[in-house]
């Protein structure tokens, strides 16, 4: 079957830059879906996305659908005809369903059968519907209409190219009649561009100063920006999302170096970077020490004969932005940071939980409680907690919300606060996302944990639990943040005590029985997904969860130990034994004695197991005290042989009540050794 390249390009007014790449991918996916549904084969595919166009190239597409045959079985012959040979309603209904007369139905087999040969259609006739369906299915939250047209799309359409081989596909889509004329760069090549064949699409547009390939433009911008930064003895800050957005804004990218006055460097560099990235889409430059240079890179969409004009224009545009940041910084510094706390009395945190001022007071007390438990200073943590929300009332954060915490850090330093107190004002929000940076100071860790626990307890206390995808207070992220800080920073905090302390801080604002237990369960449930992401089996998590350790660090150490234990050759058998022992002990009548009485042994294997348990107990006690859980389980693995021998030779449920009770006590000692680490009976 012959094949030809297929190209479709929809020209529009400027598309939303943040959505451009995803729109292109969805356009390609929709066309592929349509081609596959039509049974059309092809050898390759490529999507192109630029500010004013979405295009898809399909290589070596079948020009004709393959013929196909359909066979539909109907009712059995005995149900299709009565004794007189007349057709029944079942037969007539089947023929009607197939859209033919009963005489056209095959009656030679055990059942009625309708067979039909369907010749394949020409691909050129199928493509308009496939393209139109793909465009209709694009993920566009809000479509628009334009002029007198009743068509709807993300932006007004301007032209349409559709070629199968070197022939135009005759159709009209979104009010645009298909042709072979595209458009070049607005300024460098305002004339139409004749697309000779689909294979020549990219090069035809390149000659018209349009780089249609999103990936090519992105790579060019990234590479050229790095080169220019190196020439300035700096490194460019190139966040992937910003790079994608800039790529979506230009058809013919030309990166240029611009500068601003050095006096602006007295302003916190985070504020300058924020305004240059978010508002102007510039790439900022850092020196070798990570400090902001008074230069930045803009990406022009034209190759100017006088690039200085573009540079000067961008420098002129950014100056008022930087001047605003400078003004806010100077204004805020005119008064101590602590004085902004008063303004927070009028800022509601949550209607039932009080103001942001109230929250800061609670965080201060909770941070002071937590700090000494993780090796920090209670006084400094309390001070940091008290100042933690002050910058929310500053002009800087009012203009640049991303500066919360960062602004507080600079203002605290300006007021002469200790370095760790100042750092904690920014670190309280860490981690800001999955895999993001953690607090580096103990003061910051204490405030970060306190802030998150206060939110968890408060929101749970008023019954606003997260459901499904709805989590307006980001409680899942808060819980994961607490766990990451404690585990990755190796901080041994008893969360039970911390959560109970947090509950008390709310006083009469919340009355929820079992609130502390509910919050703790929610926090530790977050570990399940964390371990699954790390490839740790859920049974390992559950074996530790059964013991309900209050320390996240201790929990993690136990999980890692169980994971290592499961790789030992004895693990499976010992897990099965523990499960058997657990079942036996659960059926025991009355309390199980704590002491084992050797005088009731009547089998050598009882003595052997008892001796092995005694030796193991002495060996693992110091290990358990030092939380050497892996070493402890490795030592307990040596119990496999005496345990196997015991169960092979000894009937646990002996007729003599004292012998039976003593054997239960022996098995309880055995199980207790393993429960010092985890309930490995759950591993089976």
Curated annotation (Swiss-Prot):
Its main location: cytoplasm. It is an enzyme of class 6 (ligase). PROSITE patterns: AA_TRNA_LIGASE_II_GLYAB. One of its GO terms (biological process) is arginyl-tRNA aminoacylation. Its EC number is 6.1.1.14. InterPro entries: DALR_anticod-bd, Gly-tRNA-synth_bsu, Gly-tRNA-synth_heterodimer. The keyword Protein biosynthesis applies. Belongs to the class-II aminoacyl-tRNA synthetase family. HAMAP family: Gly_tRNA_synth_beta (MF_00255). Tetramer of two alpha and two beta subunits. This is Glycine--tRNA ligase beta subunit. It comes from Pseudomonas putida (strain ATCC 47054 / DSM 6125 / CFBP 8728 / NCIMB 11950 / KT2440). The gene is glyS.
């Amino acid at each position: 079957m012959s094949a030809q390249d297929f190209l479709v390009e929809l020209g529009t007014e400027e598309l939303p830059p943040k959505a451009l790449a995803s729109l292109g991918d969805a356009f390609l996916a929709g066309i592929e879906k349509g081609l596959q549904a039509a049974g059309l084969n092809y050898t390759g595919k490529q999507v192109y996305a630029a500010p004013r166009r979405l295009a898809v190239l399909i290589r070596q597409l079948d020009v004709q659908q393959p013929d196909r045959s359909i066979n539909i079985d109907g009712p059995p012959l005995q149900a299709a005809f009565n004794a007189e040979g007349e057709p029944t309603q079942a037969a007539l209904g089947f023929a009607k369903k197939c859209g033919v007369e009963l005489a056209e139905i095959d009656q030679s087999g055990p059942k009625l059968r309708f067979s039909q040969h369907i010749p394949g259609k020409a691909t050129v006739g199928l493509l308009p519907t496939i393209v139109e369906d793909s465009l209709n299915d694009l993920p566009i939250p809000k479509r628009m209409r334009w002029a007198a047209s009743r068509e709807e799309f993300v932006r007004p359409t301007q032209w349409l190219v559709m070629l199968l081989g070197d022939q135009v596909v005759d159709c009209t889509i979104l009010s645009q009649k298909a042709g072979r004329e595209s458009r070049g760069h607005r300024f460098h090549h305002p004339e139409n561009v004749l697309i000779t064949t689909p294979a020549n699409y990219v090069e035809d547009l390149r000659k018209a100063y349009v780089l249609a390939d999103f990936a090519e433009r992105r790579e060019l911008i990234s590479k050229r920006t790095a080169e220019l930064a190196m020439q300035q003895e700096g490194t460019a800050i190139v966040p992937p999302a910003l790079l994608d957005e800039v790529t979506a804004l230009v058809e013919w990218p030309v990166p240029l170096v611009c500068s601003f006055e050095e006096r602006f460097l007295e302003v916190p560099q985070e504020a300058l970077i924020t305004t240059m990235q978010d508002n102007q889409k510039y790439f900022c430059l850092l020196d070798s020490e990570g400090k902001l240079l008074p230069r930045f890179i803009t990406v022009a969409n034209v190759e100017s004969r006088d690039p200085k004009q573009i540079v000067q224009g961008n420098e002129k545009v950014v100056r008022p932005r930087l001047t605003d940041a400078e003004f806010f910084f100077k204004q805020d510094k005119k008064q101590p940071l602590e004085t902004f706390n008063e303004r927070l009395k009028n800022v509601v945190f949550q209607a039932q939980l009080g103001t942001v001022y109230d929250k800061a007071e609670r965080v201060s007390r909770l941070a002071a409680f937590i700090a000494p438990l993780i090796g920090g200073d209670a006084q400094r943590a309390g001070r940091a907690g008290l100042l933690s929300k002050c910058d929310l009332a500053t002009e800087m954060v009012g203009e640049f919300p991303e500066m919360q915490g960062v602004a507080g850090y600079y203002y605290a330093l300006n007021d002469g606060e200790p370095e760790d107190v100042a750092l904690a004002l920014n670190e309280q929000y860490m981690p800001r996302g999955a895999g993001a940076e953690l607090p580096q100071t103990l003061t910051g860790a204490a405030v970060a944990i306190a802030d998150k626990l206060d939110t968890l307890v408060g929101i749970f206390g008023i019954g606003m639990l997260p459901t499904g995808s709805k989590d307006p207070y980001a409680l899942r992220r808060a819980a994961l943040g607490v766990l990451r800080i404690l585990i990755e920073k190796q901080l041994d905090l008893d969360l039970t005590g911390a959560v109970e302390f947090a509950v008390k801080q709310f006083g009469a604002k919340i009355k929820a029985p079992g609130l502390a237990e509910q919050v703790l369960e929610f926090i530790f449930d977050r570990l399940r997904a964390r371990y699954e992401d790390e490839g740790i089996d859920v049974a390992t998590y559950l074996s530790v969860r059964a013991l309900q350790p209050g320390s996240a660090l201790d929990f993690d150490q136990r999980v890692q130990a169980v994971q290592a234990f499961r790789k030992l050759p004895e693990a499976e058998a010992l897990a099965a034994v523990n499960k058997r022992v657990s079942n036996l002990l659960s059926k025991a009548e009355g309390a199980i004695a704590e002491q084992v009485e050797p005088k009731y042994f009547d089998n050598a294997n009882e003595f052997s197991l008892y001796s092995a348990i005694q030796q193991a107990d002495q060996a693992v006690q110091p290990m358990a005290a030092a939380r050497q859980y892996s070493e402890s389980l490795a030592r307990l693995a040596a119990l496999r042989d005496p345990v196997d021998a015991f169960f092979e030779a000894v009937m646990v449920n002996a007729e003599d009540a004292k012998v039976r009770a003593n054997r239960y006590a022996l098995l309880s000692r055995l199980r207790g050794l393993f429960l010092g680490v985890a309930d490995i009976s759950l591993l089976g």
